[in-house]
Amino acid sequence: MNISRKEQRVLHVLAQGGRIRHWRDARRIVAVDCIDRDGNRLVDCDLATFDRLRRRGLIASYGGAPYVASEAGRRAVRAQPDNR
């Protein structure tokens, strides 16, 4: 699967324990914020990147919780030296 650099960065953060918080306006998601496990904000995560990852099934939200990497997302992310 072809994944852009922005998508790889977001998936890498999520694979290490990060979360994507989302805000809704009635029914639609209008804003997202990607937070790594240390509490730092990832600037590369915008609404378009979020939509692409969600459409491909690489991220998922369980029970209204923040979005995390799904099993498919963890398999799709490329290995990097600092992965845990």
Question: What is each of the regions a protein language model found here?
Answer:
Residues 65-70:
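Minor-groove-contacting beta-hairpin "wing" of winged helix-turn-helix DNA-binding domains
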Residues 54-64:
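A short, conserved structural fragment
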Residues 19-20, 59, 83:
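A general structural signal for well-ordered secondary-structure junctions
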Residues 2-47:
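Short amphipathic alpha-helical interface segments
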